[in-house]
Amino acid sequence: MHPRPWSAVRASIDRISLPAAFVDRQALRRNVERTVARIERSDVSMRIATKSIRSVEAMRTILADGGPRMVGLMCYAASEAAFLSDRGFDDLLVAYPTVQPG
């Protein structure tokens, strides 16, 4: 598959208000397939770093397409874990120290 020409990408986002994120779903799925192929050669699983994704829909796609080797989400803060829990995610790891005021 060839990447989309920039003109096609531009035409698809001209009708929406910016700033906005544009995700090529085919490219995302190919990246998930490649990543899963690498980790299947070993005895490891993978947790998505939410700090790198920043899209609930993309996280859902990655977890669904990644199969049993994609085990959940690594959140940067407890507040983000709570936000994602409210959206139905149930395998959450808060990776950084959390300090509450008071």
Spans of features found by a protein language model:
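N-terminal glycine-rich anion-binding loops that anchor highly charged ligand groups
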Residues: P3-A8, A27-R60, Y76
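Generic N-terminal amphipathic, Lys/Arg-enriched alpha-helix
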Residues: R4-V23
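Short, contiguous strand/loop micro-motifs
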Residues: L18-V23, S45-M46, G66-R69
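Alpha-helix N-cap and loop-to-helix initiation/capping positions
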Residues: V23, A27, T98-V99
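Active-site-proximal beta-alpha core segment in soluble small-molecule metabolic enzymes
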Residues: A49-G102
